[in-house]
C-alpha cells in the first residue's frame, strides 16, 4: 500500500507541474478563444491535481511512511508544506481570472483582460513555478534525511 500511495503522490505532483507548465505556455501567447478554453480546462486539472496531491501527501504522512512525528520535526518537510500552501493560495489569483472568462467563452468570444491583469496573472504563475522548484529541492533534501 505504501508503494501505491507513493506512486499516486508522484502522479499527482507530475500532473500538477505539467498543468502549471501548460498554463505558463498558454498565458504567454496571444489570448484566443481556443487558448482561453485550454486555460480553463488546464486550470481545472491543476486544481484537481493539487487537491489530490494534498490528500495523498497527508495520507502518507499520517498513515504510511515514517509517521507524522518524523515529518513534523523535519524543517525540509515543513518548508515544503508551507510552500505548497503558499502556491495554493497564489493559484487563486489566476483561477479567479480564468473563471471570470466563462461567460465570454460560452458566448464564443475571446475574453477581455487588460494588460495589468495579464501581467499579474503571469507573475503569479512565475512565482508558483519558482516555489515548486524549491518544493522539489526540499523533497530531495527530505529523501536524503537532511535538514531535520
PLM region spans:
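Polytopic transmembrane helical bundles with strong interfacial aromatic enrichment
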Residues: 1-148
Amino acid at each position: 500500500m505504501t508503494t501505491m500511495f507513493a506512486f499516486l503522490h508522484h502522479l499527482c505532483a507530475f500532473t500538477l507541474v505539467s498543468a502549471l507548465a501548460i498554463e505558463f505556455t498558454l498565458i504567454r501567447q496571444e489570448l484566443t478563444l481556443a487558448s482561453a478554453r485550454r486555460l480553463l480546462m488546464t486550470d481545472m486539472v491543476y486544481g484537481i491535481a493539487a487537491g489530490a496531491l494534498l490528500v495523498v501527501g497527508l495520507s502518507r504522512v499520517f498513515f504510511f511512511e515514517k509517521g507524522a512525528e518524523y515529518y513534523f520535526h523535519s524543517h525540509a518537510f515543513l518548508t515544503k508544506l508551507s510552500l505548497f500552501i503558499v502556491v495554493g493560495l497564489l493559484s487563486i489569483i489566476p483561477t479567479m481570472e480564468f473563471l471570470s472568462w466563462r461567460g465570454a467563452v460560452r458566448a464564443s468570444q475571446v475574453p477581455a483582460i487588460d494588460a495589468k491583469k495579464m501581467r499579474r496573472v503571469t507573475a503569479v504563475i512565475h512565482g508558483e513555478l519558482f516555489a515548486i522548484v524549491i518544493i522539489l529541492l526540499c523533497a530531495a533534501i527530505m529523501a536524503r534525511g537532511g535538514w531535520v
